[in-house]
Amino acid sequence: VGCEECPAHCKGKNAIPTCDDGVCNCNV
């Protein structure tokens, strides 16, 4: 999942979307 799709990807998981080196991470 790219950075631009990250917020939508993490939505509903009580997670904070972060992006490192172009990689989406959902930090719970």
UniProtKB/Swiss-Prot annotation:
<dbReference type="GO" id="GO:0090729">
    <property type="term" value="F:toxin activity"/>
</dbReference>
<feature type="disulfide bond">
    <location>
        <begin position="3"/>
        <end position="19"/>
    </location>
</feature>
<comment type="function">
    <text>Calcium channel activator. Rapidly and reversibly activates ryanodine receptor 1 (RYR1).</text>
</comment>
<protein>
    <recommendedName>
        <fullName>Potassium channel toxin alpha-KTx 9.7</fullName>
    </recommendedName>
</protein>
<keyword id="KW-0528">Neurotoxin</keyword>
<dbReference type="InterPro" id="IPR036574">
    <property type="entry name" value="Scorpion_toxin-like_sf"/>
</dbReference>
<keyword id="KW-0964">Secreted</keyword>
<dbReference type="InterPro" id="IPR008911">
    <property type="entry name" value="Toxin_alpha-KTx_8/9"/>
</dbReference>
<keyword id="KW-1015">Disulfide bond</keyword>
<feature type="disulfide bond">
    <location>
        <begin position="10"/>
        <end position="26"/>
    </location>
</feature>
<dbReference type="GO" id="GO:0005246">
    <property type="term" value="F:calcium channel regulator activity"/>
</dbReference>
<dbReference type="GO" id="GO:0008200">
    <property type="term" value="F:ion channel inhibitor activity"/>
</dbReference>
<dbReference type="Pfam" id="PF05453">
    <property type="entry name" value="Toxin_6"/>
</dbReference>
<dbReference type="GO" id="GO:0005576">
    <property type="term" value="C:extracellular region"/>
</dbReference>
<feature type="disulfide bond">
    <location>
        <begin position="6"/>
        <end position="24"/>
    </location>
</feature>
<keyword id="KW-0108">Calcium channel impairing toxin</keyword>
<keyword id="KW-0800">Toxin</keyword>
<keyword id="KW-1219">Ryanodine-sensitive calcium-release channel impairing toxin</keyword>
<comment type="similarity">
    <text>Belongs to the short scorpion toxin superfamily. Potassium channel inhibitor family. Alpha-KTx 09 subfamily.</text>
</comment>
<keyword id="KW-0872">Ion channel impairing toxin</keyword>
<dbReference type="GO" id="GO:0044472">
    <property type="term" value="P:envenomation resulting in modulation of calcium channel activity in another organism"/>
</dbReference>
